[in-house]
Structures are given as structure tokens and as C-alpha cells.
């Protein structure tokens, strides 16, 4: 599925949902994305980074999005791709980070005109803000377990602390 919205000033935001696209070749043929960028977007283990392509002035951001559904004993993060071209911002998303697209859409709807970079950085802030409640909860849990360990050191409490450190 493709979402296309106007940012203003002739700029466009296009979101490509990888889970709903029928043919991945469309990313290259229709949207002009290079093979390397497509490979970044498809790689579940891609690390967060930024690339600048001097030839065409394209900037690619890979940013880690927190999966809000804790399926395991720990939280996972999944990469989301942002591509900034001359007059458009392309995001490549999936079901794990769809909540970000919804929040980006609400942000866009509440602002008349946005530059590509203002919208990009607002989007990155949306993603970063999702981490704060999780970090605060983990910090609170760590303090509780530390308090229990100070009262009485048990194997169970040591494992609980260990789980927090890896989670």
C-alpha cells in the first residue's frame, strides 16, 4: 500500500508499506530507488545510520523504531527507512512500525505547510519519544529490584536484575 501526502511548497511525502507492496521491483521502477537503498530497507538487522549520495543529493536515514508490543522478555527495535530527495520524502515502513506512520499523518494534518526536513526531524522525534516511557518503566523496575536485593540477595532477584539489563 502506498500513502502519498502533500507537505506544501510542492513537496510530497510517500510512505511505502513493505508488507502490502505486491512487487518489490516497484520500489526501483516506480519510485526510482536504487538497489542498495532497497536492500537497506529490507534488512531486518540493518543498523541505524545515515548515507548521503553526492551524485543525486539523496539522503538516506535508517532509524530504529521501538516495537511497542513486547513479544519476548525484552523490547525489540526495527529499522525504518527515510529517503530525502529534492522534492519528496519517502518512508519505507511495515506493520511493526505502522504506529509511527499514523503519528506522522496526524502531525502532518495538524500543520499547514512543512518543509521536508522539518517533517523528517519531527518524525524522528516521534520515534524517539516512544522510547521514553519504556526506559522510565525499566528504570523503575531496576530500582525496585535493586531495593529487593539490598534487603535480601536471592537468586530470583539476581535473575530479575539480569533480565532488566538485557531487556
Question: Positions of the model-derived regions?
Answer:
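Peripheral, non-transmembrane regulatory/ligand-interaction domains of membrane transport proteins
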Residues: 1-167
Amino acid at each position: 500500500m502506498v500513502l502519498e501526502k502533500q507537505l506544501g511548497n510542492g513537496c510530497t511525502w510517500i510512505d511505502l508499506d513493505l508488507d502490502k507492496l505486491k512487487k518489490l521491483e516497484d520500489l526501483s521502477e516506480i519510485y526510482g530507488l536504487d538497489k542498495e537503498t532497497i536492500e537497506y530497507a529490507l534488512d531486518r538487522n540493518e543498523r541505524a545510520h545515515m548515507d548521503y549520495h553526492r551524485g543525486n543529493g539523496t539522503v538516506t536515514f535508517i532509524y530504529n523504531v521501538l516495537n511497542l508490543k513486547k513479544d519476548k522478555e525484552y523490547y525489540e527495535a526495527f529499522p525504518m527507512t527515510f529517503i530525502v530527495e529534492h522534492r519528496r520524502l519517502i518512508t519505507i515502513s511495515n506493520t511493526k512500525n505502522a504506529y509511527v506512520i499514523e503519528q506522522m499523518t496526524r502531525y502532518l494534518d495538524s500543520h499547514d505547510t512543512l518543509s521536508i526536513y522539518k517533517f523528517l526531524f519531527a518524525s524522528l522525534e516521534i520515534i524517539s519519544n516512544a522510547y521514553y516511557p519504556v526506559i522510565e518503566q525499566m528504570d523503575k523496575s531496576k530500582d525496585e529490584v535493586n531495593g529487593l536485593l539490598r534487603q535480601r540477595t536471592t537468586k530470583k532477584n539476581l535473575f530479575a536484575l539480569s533480565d532488566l539489563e538485557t531487556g
